[in-house]
């Protein structure tokens, strides 16, 4: 039996998908801009 691939960790989640991580790169800022334009309630993890 193989283990499940998703092993939740809030720290890793925030570091890779959090708001600060998004703001750190140009691509991430574009992601936030797209999500704002779409009207998302939550912009990032």
Curated annotation (Swiss-Prot):
The keyword Ribosomal protein applies. Belongs to the bacterial ribosomal protein bL34 family. One of its GO terms (molecular function) is structural constituent of ribosome. Keywords: Ribonucleoprotein, Ribosomal protein. Residues 1-21 are annotated as: Disordered. The keyword Ribosomal protein applies. The lineage of its organism: Bacteria, Pseudomonadati, Pseudomonadota, Gammaproteobacteria, Alteromonadales. Gene3D superfamilies: 1.10.287.3980. It comes from the Bacteria. HAMAP family: Ribosomal_bL34. Residues 11-20 have a biased composition (Basic residues). It comes from Shewanella baltica (strain OS155 / ATCC BAA-1091). Pfam families: Ribosomal_L34. PANTHER family: LARGE RIBOSOMAL SUBUNIT PROTEIN BL34M, MITOCHONDRIAL RIBOSOMAL PROTEIN 34 FAMILY MEMBER. This is Large ribosomal subunit protein bL34. GO terms for biological process: translation. GO terms for cellular component: ribonucleoprotein complex; ribosome.
């Amino acid at each position: 039996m193989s283990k499940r691939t998703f092993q939740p960790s809030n720290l890793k989640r925030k570091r890779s998908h959090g708001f600060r991580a998004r703001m750190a790169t140009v691509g991430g800022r574009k992601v936030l801009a797209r999500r704002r334009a779409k009207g998302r309630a939550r912009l990032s993890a």
